[in-house]
Amino acid sequence: MTALHTIEFQKRGLPHAHLIFWLMEDTTNPTPSLINRFISAEIPDPNEDPLGYALVAEHMIHGPCGPLNPNAPCMKNGKCSKGYPKPFQTETSIDPNGFATYKRPDNGRFVQKGPHRLSNQWVVP
């Protein structure tokens, strides 16, 4: 794998990164198994991977929004503009246009955000 990046500083001084990765194998027609090697929409097992669990809980959970928080900034016309919560998905799939729908198993794992238990349906890949 090869990577190239640039970091810009926005008007308020916050960094903004642009990243590009070149993978050494042919990725022109990705398969679900290839996608699963690099992208995950699952909460890690807190006993097997406590650091991964903590990082996903802190940085990769959307919301809550929808009926759990109708005043969330992402809400437009009573629905989440980002499509959360996403439906559970047993396997990663790719539609005819090449759009991937990521695996989101209903495995009982959750992240507690205030009074809400957020499952894999709320993970931002």
Regions found by a protein language model. Give the residues of each.
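Extended, structured polyanion-binding interfaces
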Residues: 1-125
